[in-house]
């Protein structure tokens, strides 16, 4: 069994593991081209599709991820995800503000942890996020961590965080063109990019206890690299995200984009540790519909996910 303090620690780590709480605004572009937005990530689909990932931390495998896109009525889509992580070194990954939020020294907590993260979000026909829910479960810990959020048509976002007796809720009025962006876990596609393209992305976390919760990232498409994927060589564009506009600083995050806009690799640096998502080739032995049924069954077993399950069945 984990100590009770670890349950509180999961509340912080949930935002890192599932990453639904990172809000980003696409600012005016540096060049004439518009930056890739939600329309290039999730577009209305007629058929169910899925993407699987292998997760590496500092070149060691630590887990896997699966996301399934389910088409809905009137051009809407639902995105289901499952993130399974094993033996994560918390001392290496926790942000500096974790101790402040927990009220204790994070270095005294358990050195590693296993967890399952379940996510669900709905996106309208315009590519705008309407609601999201997440659950994080840890083996040996009875209480699950629940994250949920809604975005109203007038751009008011409400985020709730709950685990046992602990509850936290915050609301923000966001400017126009804000969208939820998952910074750390992988996005499947980024269509319409070209060499030399640049744009800026402010990252905003409503749970970070700081007076300056917004951080500007500078994105650029610069460089090619040939990757070996699905038994063939693929030429990719490299998209880099930096905390400064010049290209001399090492990137905080990079993505390798294939010729059809598919993201083949997603690498992020978290407090000196390298987190890498490697896209898996399509497994023809299990269809996307079967994967969707499987991932929904996992959600239904997760504590408190019955609300989402009942909504989907209606």
Walk through the language-model features, giving the residues of each:
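Acidic, serine/threonine-rich low-complexity disordered tracts
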Residues: 2-155, 161-172, 192-314
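Short helix-loop boundary/capping segments
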Residues: 167-189
């Amino acid at each position: 069994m984990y100590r009770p303090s670890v349950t509180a620690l999961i509340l912080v780590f949930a935002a890192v593991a599932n990453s639904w709480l990172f809000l980003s605004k696409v600012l005016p572009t540096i060049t004439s081209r518009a930056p890739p937005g939600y329309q290039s990530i999730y577009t209305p689909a007629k058929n169910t599709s899925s993407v699987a990932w292998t997760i590496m931390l500092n070149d060691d495998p630590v887990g896997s991820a699966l996301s399934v896109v389910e088409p809905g009525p009137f051009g809407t889509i639902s995105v289901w995800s499952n993130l399974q992580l094993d033996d994560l070194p918390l001392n290496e990954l926790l942000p500096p503000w974790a101790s402040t939020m927990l009220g204790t020294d994070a270095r005294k907590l358990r050195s590693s942890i296993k967890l399952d993260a379940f996510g669900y979000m709905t996106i309208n026909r315009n590519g705008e996020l309407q609601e999201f829910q997440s659950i994080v479960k840890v083996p040996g810990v009875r209480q699950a961590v629940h994250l949920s959020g809604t975005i109203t048509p007038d751009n008011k976002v409400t985020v709730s965080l709950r685990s046992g007796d602990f509850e936290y809720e915050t609301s923000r009025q966001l400017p126009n063109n804000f969208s939820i962006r998952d910074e750390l876990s992988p996005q499947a596609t980024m269509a319409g990019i070209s060499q030399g393209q640049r744009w800026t992305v402010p990252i905003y976390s409503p749970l970070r206890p700081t007076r300056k919760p917004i951080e500007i990232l500078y994105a650029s498409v610069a460089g090619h690299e040939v990757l070996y994927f699905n038994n063939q060589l693929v030429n990719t564009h490299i998209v880099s995200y930096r905390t400064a506009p010049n290209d001399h600083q090492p990137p905080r995050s990079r993505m390798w984009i294939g010729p059809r806009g598919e993201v083949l690799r997603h690498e992020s640096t978290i407090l000196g540790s390298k987190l890498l998502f490697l896209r898996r080739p399509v497994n023809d032995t299990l269809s996307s519909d079967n994967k969707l049924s499987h991932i929904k069954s996992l959600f239904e077993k997760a504590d408190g996910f019955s609300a989402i399950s009942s909504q989907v069945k209606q």
